[in-house]
């Protein structure tokens, strides 16, 4: 068996409305009575002070009503840049980290996952993502208001946090490749532009 390396990417962007939504989302999270996660054994090293993963498929949460319309608009720009037209959100949830909290190595379901750094004071712990080709670890340099998306099969983790509280929003989504209003939902023009010869008749 051999591995054939192809290019893939981590998409790194900003929520343009971050300052408009941050405080209201945090206020709704503070009002909630969600639990914590403690899972420390030979398989997992997870300690998260507050999260709502157990209801991540429910869209009626107050903070999510603020976040989701804004996120979908920003996400659409990102997925268009990599050749797709429609994302189908499967799960959205928040995680709050206090001093020493951590999220060990793990993967997600669906095509893509990612992180929005809602509350991220300077010095907070970062996200690390592993290349499945050579197992090299990439630490993602972000600031508050940024969001990233990456293939959900990539092994990744959240490093142990500092004394400052960190709040992130994570999400899983898949790409819908079915036609939209009779048009191809995959941006084949991007492929044609880079590879014009593969559209020419074969000799």
Language-model features: where?
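Non-heme Fe(II)/2-oxoglutarate
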Residues: 1-82, 102, 199-201
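Short, well-ordered beta-strand micro-motif
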Residues: 12-14, 149, 172
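Hydrophobic, well-ordered secondary-structure segments
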Residues: 18, 28-32, 63-81, 130-133, ...
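Catalytic core of non-heme Fe(II) oxygenases with the double-stranded beta-helix
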Residues: 87-154, 159-160, 165-168, 175-187
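Short, cationic low-complexity segments
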Residues: 189-203
């Amino acid at each position: 068996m051999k591995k054939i390396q192809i290019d893939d990417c981590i998409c790194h962007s900003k929520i343009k409305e971050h300052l408009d939504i941050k405080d209201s989302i945090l206020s709704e999270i503070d009002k909630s009575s969600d639990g914590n996660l403690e899972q420390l054994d030979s398989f997992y090293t997870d300690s998260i002070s507050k999260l709502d993963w157990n209801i991540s498929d429910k869209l009626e949460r107050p903070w999510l009503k603020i976040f989701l319309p804004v996120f979908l608009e920003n996400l659409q720009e990102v997925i268009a840049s990599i050749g797709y037209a429609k994302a189908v959100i499967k799960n959205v949830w928040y995680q709050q980290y206090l001093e020493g909290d951590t999220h060990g190595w793990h993967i997600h379901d669906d095509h893509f996952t990612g992180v929005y750094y809602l509350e991220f004071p300077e010095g907070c712990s970062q996200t690390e993502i592993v290349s499945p080709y050579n197992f090299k670890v990439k630490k993602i340099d972000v600031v508050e208001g940024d969001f990233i998306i990456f293939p959900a099969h990539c092994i990744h983790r959240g490093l142990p946090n500092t004394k400052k509280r960190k709040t992130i929003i994570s999400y899983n989504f898949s790409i819908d490749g079915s036609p939209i209003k009779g048009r191809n939902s995959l941006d084949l023009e991007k492929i044609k532009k880079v590879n014009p010869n593969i559209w020419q008749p074969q000799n």
